[in-house]
């Protein structure tokens, strides 16, 4: 495979490099370089538009320019720090979005920042109307770099850095765990010699004198984990061309280690090789073409098992993963023979430990269970042809695009089995020895490589469009786009394809570059609906006014640009129609009841799963938005702001409340209730971008601020609650619901005087006490209330601040992001500790008679804890945070130093990512309990241009 990859890379580089031609001519582009910088072309739906002519709902990031001061490794890395309207999760608070790379639906994680020219965020409904159904919730359009006319330019960039874990979970050691577990048994009335740990056992575990007999297992010890993991990458870019052909090539490779330092896991790694080539060809004065290809080879190697999940569950006193062979009594020939015959002697001196209850464990898995490799391959190809039809009609052009993408992935593994040994310990003359050894399991290494998890995906996209541009009498500027587009995505083991097909029209008119009218429409199609409802019309209209071009501002030297616009749209989408044939009725016998028939035979009933609704139709996005943009003081200050209000109407559910109760039965399970367009959601919000450029002395400063705020409301729901406070209608759509607490029960009298709590178990002092919202003297689900916003689609308020300072060859860059207004529950097993769960440091604040006035945690229990461990404001915390996301210092060698040399540019930089979190809940927000830790990343890099 490695030889194949190298040949492929060399062929691609030679092919693209050969396009470079001596004596390249200068560009004859009518737009000057200075104009491109002040008013660049921006990729919007199926066309490029001058940034000053965009009438709102669109933001753009120049990634190529950004990388000069902020090197990063993910295409969407902290984009909320640069543009308003994107909060890191969604556009304008919607619950989905479409990612396009060079106009084709693709994955954002399969294009690196070094390959990207610009990213356009199309937020408003008017901006995405031409994309049809699948683009109705917003589009992120990523355009890759292309070749330019000029000499061949070779750029090489290399980076290496280290991820350093921010924090690890803190679990109790064996002795403390055993002590508190005994306390939990006492609380439950279950303590006794057969259930409780003895004082002697607790003492022996506490001393640490023999951790093999009395283990005190710490998953986060330096015995198992490295302090950091390395990530290194190298990228080569080659570009150039002449007036006939231009090319761009990107070849990149990165490798990343893992934290583990033992067993098969010490060789864990992932690596990615990518080759991209983009070619533009001027066939003749009337025809242009482009051919783009990209190939990605991704591999990951991992030991068998999930270490981080095991670390959250395996108690510290359960096992000793490795036991020295030297502890076996010297005259125990049988045990020594049994151990020496195993296939898994670790480091020549340890055998795998376990218990009869723990016949496998993650440590033994990492040493002896084998390993797996994940392999992913992607090939992407697209071609475009542009026809200038001026001989037919001046200003008329035609463009067409065709793309085919293939992606495949699979797992290969060596799946071994192993035995563990359970020692029986004795003490002779004060020394611990293993007097007997039990073996459980079978050692087996078949040497067979297994293949599993094979998946394939194919995407085919096509578009064809006519474009028309003309100016009448120097004041009437008209442009239009008529586009037909569609794509299909086929996935293995999925019968129906994901499809999108639409016909779109956009007509733009402006008078004297002052008054703008944009009219857009698309005819969308969906096979997920019944015949007669599969097509829908989506209109959009925008009015704009460039005040700067009015006479009353024409001579205002402080105002460079001032534009106001307003848009209204109704888009139809099938994105929330999850399956095909939801409009059809459905019957089956899966939940049918058995009933007797003749001669003792039984028959199962055929039941209705749902009724039919042939009137099921598209969900509608109805939106009104306004936008203002300005540039002041010779581009010293630029600002853009949008306000939006939209309603997603006709979301599909099965509305039980509008049908008689007998339409559904619980046994046998049956229903005649069909799917229907019923639920409605409303979102209201704004986004702001402000940029300030200023030179102070010899330092050039650039300060950018971005903000996004949105509020949501469930305006219609299928509900029939007994009490108004239970209704979801009128509340935030990402609402978190739960009980309100009144602290802990103080004593038995307090329990008897309070409403009965019906969640299970016997209520005792130290349990959580809840508010009886409806005063029915019972605490149950009817007492759950709205507690706050979950921020499922991004924080309600998102902030971003970026600062650039340039002094001679030095550049300082800093980026901060913040999210405010959301809440979350501490509801993982790290916080909800009960039964035989692993005890975290949180339980130290448990309620006892001695700590009843200061307790921060309910009484301990070995039972389910159903009363305490449920959603309530006791477990609620605010996720408000500000992150120092990036700091980078760069240095560019002066041009004078590089004169007459082969090097045109040399720059070096150091950076740190995810450096600081400012929050009252910092420790909670920075902690991962069942996955790899969050990390700070420290990087050093160099870039050389030939």
Q: What name fits each language-model region?
A:
Residues 1-276, 288-290, 930:
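Short, small/polar-rich motifs associated with maturation and membrane association
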Residues 364, 819-908, 912:
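Extracytoplasmic gating/loop element in the C-terminal half of outer-membrane beta-barrel translocons
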Residues 104-147, 167-172, 215-235, 254-292, ...:
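Outer-membrane beta-barrel proteins
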Residues 394, 793-825:
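Glycine-rich, aromatic-lined ligand/substrate-binding cores of catalytic
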Residues 65, 255, 525-527, 694, ...:
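A generic structural motif
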């Amino acid at each position: 495979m490695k030889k194949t990859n190298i040949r492929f890379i060399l062929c691609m580089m030679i092919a693209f490099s050969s396009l470079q031609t001596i004596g390249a001519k200068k560009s004859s582009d009518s737009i000057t370089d200075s104009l491109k910088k002040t008013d660049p072309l921006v990729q919007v739906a199926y066309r490029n538009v001058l940034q000053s002519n965009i009438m709102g709902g669109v933001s753009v990031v120049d990634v190529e320019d950004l990388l000069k001061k902020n090197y990063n490794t993910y295409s969407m890395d902290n984009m909320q720090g640069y543009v308003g309207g994107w909060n890191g999760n969604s556009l304008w608070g919607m619950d989905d979005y479409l990612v396009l790379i060079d106009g084709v639906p693709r994955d954002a994680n399969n294009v690196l920042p070094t390959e990207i020219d610009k990213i356009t965020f199309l937020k408003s409904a008017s901006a995405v109307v031409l994309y049809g159904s699948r683009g109705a919730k917003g589009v992120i359009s990523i355009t890759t770099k292309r070749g330019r006319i000029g000499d061949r330019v070779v750029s090489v960039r290399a980076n290496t850095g280290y991820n350093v874990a921010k924090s690890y979970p803190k679990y109790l050691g064996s002795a403390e765990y055993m002590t508190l577990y005994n306390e939990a048994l006492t609380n439950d009335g279950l303590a006794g010699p057969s259930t409780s740990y003895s004082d002697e056992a607790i003492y022996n575990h506490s001393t640490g004198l023999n951790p093999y007999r009395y283990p005190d297992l710490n998953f986060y010890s330096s015995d198992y984990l490295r302090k950091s993991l390395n990530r290194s990458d190298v990228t080569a870019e080659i570009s150039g061309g002449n007036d006939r052909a231009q090319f761009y090539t990107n070849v990149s490779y990165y490798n990343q280690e893992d934290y583990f330092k033992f067993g098969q896991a010490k060789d864990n790694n992932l690596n990615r090789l990518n080759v991209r080539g983009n070619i533009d060809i001027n066939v003749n004065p009337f025809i242009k073409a482009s051919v783009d290809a990209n190939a990605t080879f991704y591999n990951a190697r991992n030991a068998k098992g999930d270490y981080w999940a095991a670390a959250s569950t395996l108690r510290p006193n359960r096992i000793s993963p490795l036991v020295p062979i030297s502890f076996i009594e010297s005259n125990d020939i049988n045990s020594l023979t049994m151990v020496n015959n195993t296939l898994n002697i670790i480091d020549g001196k340890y055998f795998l430990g376990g218990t009869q209850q723990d016949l496998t464990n993650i440590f033994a898995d990492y040493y002896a269970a084998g390993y797996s490799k994940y392999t992913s391959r992607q090939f992407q190809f697209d071609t475009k042809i542009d026809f200038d039809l001026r001989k037919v009609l001046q200003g008329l052009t035609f463009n067409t695009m065709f793309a085919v993408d293939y992606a495949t992935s699979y797992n290969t593994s060596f799946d071994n089995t192993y035995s563990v040994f359970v020692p029986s310990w004795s003490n002779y003359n004060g020394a611990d020895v293993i007097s007997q050894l039990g073996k459980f399991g079978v050692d087996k290494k078949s040497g067979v490589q297994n293949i599993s998890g094979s998946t394939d995906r194919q995407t085919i996209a096509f578009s064809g469009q006519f474009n028309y541009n003309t100016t009448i009498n120097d004041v009437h500027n008209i442009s239009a786009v008529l586009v037909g587009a569609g794509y299909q995505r086929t996935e293995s083991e999925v019968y129906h394809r994901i499809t999108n097909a639409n016909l779109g029209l956009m007509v733009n008119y402006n008078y004297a570059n002052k008054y703008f009218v944009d009219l857009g429409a698309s005819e969308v199609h969906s096979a997920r609906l019944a015949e007669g409802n599969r097509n829908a019309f989506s209109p959009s209209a925008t009015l704009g006014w460039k005040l700067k071009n009015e006479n009353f501002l024409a001579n205002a030297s402080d105002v460079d640009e001032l534009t106001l616009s307003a848009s209204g749209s109704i888009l139809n989408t099938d994105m929330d129609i999850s399956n095909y044939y939801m409009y059809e009725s459905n019957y089956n016998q899966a939940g049918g009841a058995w009933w007797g028939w003749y001669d003792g035979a039984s028959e199962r009933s055929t039941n209705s799963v749902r009724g039919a609704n042939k009137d099921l139709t598209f969900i509608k996005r109805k939106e009104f938005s306004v936008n203002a943009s300005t540039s002041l003081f010779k581009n010293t200050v630029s600002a853009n702001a949008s306000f939006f209000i939209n309603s997603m109407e006709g979301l599909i559910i099965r509305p039980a409340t509008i049908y008689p109760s007998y339409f559904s039965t619980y046994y046998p399970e049956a229903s005649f209730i069909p799917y229907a367009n019923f639920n409605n959601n409303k979102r209201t919000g704004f986004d702001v971008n402000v940029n300030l450029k200023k030179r102070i002395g010899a330092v050039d400063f650039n300060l950018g601020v971005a903000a996004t705020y949105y509020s949501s409301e469930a305006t219609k729901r299928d509900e029939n609650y007994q009490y108004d406070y239970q209704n979801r209608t009128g509340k935030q759509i990402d609402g978190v619901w739960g009980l309100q607490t009144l602290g802990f029960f103080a004593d038995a009298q307090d329990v008897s005087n309070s409403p009965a709590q019906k969640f299970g178990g016997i209520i005792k002092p130290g349990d959580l006490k809840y508010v009886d919202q409806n005063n029915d003297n019972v605490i149950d689900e009817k007492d759950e209330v709205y507690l706050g916003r979950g921020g499922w689609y991004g924080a309600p308020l998102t902030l971003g601040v970026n600062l650039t300072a340039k002094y001679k060859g030095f550049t300082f860059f800093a980026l901060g992001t913040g999210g405010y207004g959301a809440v979350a529950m501490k509801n993982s097993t790290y916080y909800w500790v009960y039964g035989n769960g692993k005890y975290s440091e949180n339980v130290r604040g448990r309620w006892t008679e001695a700590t009843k006035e200061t307790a921060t945690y309910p009484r301990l229990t070995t039972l389910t804890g159903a009363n305490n461990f449920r959603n309530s404001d006791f477990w609620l915390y605010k996720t408000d945070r500000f992150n120092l996301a990036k700091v980078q210092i760069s240095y560019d060698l002066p041009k004078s130093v590089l004169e007459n040399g082969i090097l045109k540019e040399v720059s070096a930089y150091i950076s740190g990512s995810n450096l600081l979190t400012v929050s009252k809940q910092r420790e909670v927000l920075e902690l991962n309990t069942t996955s790899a830790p969050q990390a700070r990343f420290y990087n050093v890099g160099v870039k050389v241009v030939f």
